[in-house]
């Protein structure tokens, strides 16, 4: 049963449902990609300012943070929605210029946060909250356009590839005690999402060969595409080495694959996401993928550059998420509330993982869509379920956490054990913390590591062409280490001594790689 204030909150949301739906549909038809959500952020900020809320803009490029109260003695609850879409250009409402589409339902999250703000900013409701509420539109949850984001990193515009990681880095969440997040569903459901999720790391691979006439003089070339083919097959044969309990996922794509069929490819590039249940699991898998890429380079005589980018940390469940269940039960009607608790693990990843390592994270799922998320067939099924229901749930969770003396919020905060403090996450310099959290130690530049020294040696021994810039490139390498496991692979005494001295070429320490 709802108490009087809960009834008022739901009535306030229902009274503004047309505005909530209109806002959501506006975002639906004008999706933007991560760190580029200027229009969406501007729309959200305008509504928050219209409610008289103090609002900060441009956080982590496009983030928007609004405060219900200017100060408070109680806990601060952050209701968080994600601004960005996915690059799915064949979706019916994809942005014709960028291909962005809201195929993950982030527009529903933003509608939920916006609708909750409409209700909680009512003076009577706000007075009943012993604490503060932050309404946050965050950028770049989807880890896409990796090359573009890497360029933004080089320019100093961002340091991490996802928005929440950037917000943590710049201190925009320092005053937040509990974060509440929402996920859209293509089923009619009311779900308490208190599960763990995989973390991941991202790899960029570049094979550098030599172009030649593929018909007239293929022997003069070094085929970077062949190197990539060998590497991808080598990755596939690694899969049987991944332990089931580590829930490892390795998936990638070619981002550049040569320019013409009759020209030996001299520049082939790939992106890989490497996921696992624990940091140790996905770092182990990443080493195996790196090893597979080196195998392709060794076999063909190509140069190889490996760039390692931090992804997201695994999501850590809270000990008590019953407040989410209680809020869902008030709006679910005859549909039962379901749970995915700590015993359930998802192989997906998200930048909520980084948040969950430092502060309590409460999450819920609601429906209103049909089709398949992250697919071109996702479409709106029920505007009320998709947009208005999340607003009620967001607002009810905030109220339940902060009603009275905010006992439920304080209990969650007291039972939470941080995996990383802010200081541990950021480190003493605040620059390479995320890399350290992922077991990565090297700074962001210079990029990559190279096998060209090894290629030069093999070229001398076997009279094969080698990368023309091998000596120059190898001078750029910033770190080397030894891996005893590689030494025993080579039995020829004449070559073995060279490999013993230079086996770091087989297992080099690349940008951001520690092992």
Language-model-detected regions and their locations in the chain:
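Acidic/His- and Gly-rich active-site-bordering loop/insert found
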Residues: 2-103, 107-134, 139
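Metal-dependent amide/peptide-bond hydrolase catalytic core
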Residues: 2-4, 226-452
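Divalent metal-coordination and catalytic microenvironments
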Residues: 27, 79, 106, 135, ...
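Histidine/acidic-residue-rich, glycine-tolerant segments that coordinate divalent metal ions
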Residues: 91-101, 107-108, 123-251, 258-263
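Short, intrinsically disordered C-terminal tails of secreted or membrane-associated proteins
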Residues: 504-514
